[in-house]
From Swiss-Prot:
The keyword Heme does not apply. GO terms for molecular function: 3'-nucleotidase activity; 5'-nucleotidase activity; exopolyphosphatase activity; metal ion binding; nucleotide binding. Its EC number is 3.1.3.5. PANTHER family: 5'-NUCLEOTIDASE SURE, 5'_3'-NUCLEOTIDASE SURE. InterPro entries: SurE (IPR030048), SurE-like_Pase/nucleotidase (IPR002828), SurE-like_sf (IPR036523). It is found in: Cytoplasm. Nucleotidase that shows phosphatase activity on nucleoside 5'-monophosphates. Pfam families: SurE. This is 5'-nucleotidase SurE.
């Protein structure tokens, strides 16, 4: 029986510690192919490259692993992998990460990590985005390996509904072992931005975005609650942004003319 084919992507770039950890774990589960950005692409969301060149170069960073570095975005990496690198072979699983930093709650909309996974879901492929709530470039991923393997194995064995991707976040290293896995909803939280006005050495004005993450959702069924209480959070996500619950109300209440 042939090994599962697993495509690995990320947004922190091919040189990150997180992707190296993910490749290590996925190599225990199947045949791994890597297509990742050649430089950090954090916060790129679902951007794709249009009207500009895309470059793809083979990489020897991971001995025994077929790997490529791409000049484009995380979503570009998935598209190039499917249509060029894999040459018609269909991955059994696409995994993205492990991101250096949280992609819980509203961050999923800005996340290049999750956009790579969502792009795979758009292609009808099972996909998972993994993130660690630690922004340090040298973050310790050792405590999440077993959970990454467990979750990926579940998807490989049992599958996942088409159009759905899993957003998995891990607490940073803590003094006690992680308590387990919580399947939960996305918290209603947001980033409260502020912009620092600064001047470069030539006296030209520029702005630097700063701010803080604000979670005012007190629910104990959210990803933010799970992470704050020592659990791995798993949120099933859909790329269908339709507010289905409002379709009937708007058709009833809004006085549009219907043919």
């Amino acid at each position: 029986m042939s090994k599962p084919l697993i495509l690995v992507c990320n947004d922190d770039g091919i040189f990150s510690v997180g992707i190296r950890t993910l490749i290590e774990v996925m190599s225990e589960l199947g045949e791994v192919v890597v297509v990742a950005p050649d430089s950090p692409q954090s916060g790129m969301g679902h951007a794709i490259t249009i009207g500009n060149t895309l470059r793809l170069e083979a990489s020897d960073l991971f001995p025994g692993i077929v790997a490529y570095e791409c000049s484009g975005t995380p979503a570009d990496c998935v598209k190039l992998a499917k249509h060029h690198v894999l040459k018609g072979r269909k991955p059994d699983l696409v995994v993205s990460g492990i991101n250096h930093g949280s992609n819980s709650s509203i961050s999923v909309l800005y996340s290049g990590t999750m956009s790579a996974a969502i792009e795979a879901a758009l292609e009808g492929l099972p996909a998972i985005g993994f993130s660690l709530c630690d922004y340090n470039a040298h973050a310790d991923f050792s405590h999440v390996k077993a959970f990454v393997k467990q979750i990926a194995s579940e998807v490989l064995t049992n599958g996942i509904a088409k159009g759905i991707t899993l957003n998995v976040n891990f607490p940073a290293v803590i003094n006690a072992p992680l308590k387990g896995i919580k399947i939960c909803r996305q918290a209603h939280a947001r980033w409260e931005e502020k912009f620092d006005e600064r001047f470069d050495p030539y006296g030209r004005r520029y702005f630097w975005m700063a701010g803080s993450f604000e979670n005012k959702d007190a629910g104990e069924d959210t990803d933010e609650w799970a992470l704050a209480n020592g659990y791995v959070s798993v949120v099933p996500c859909s790329y269908d942004l339709t507010a289905h619950q409002l379709l009937g109300q708007l058709n009833r209440d809004w006085k549009f003319i219907h043919e």
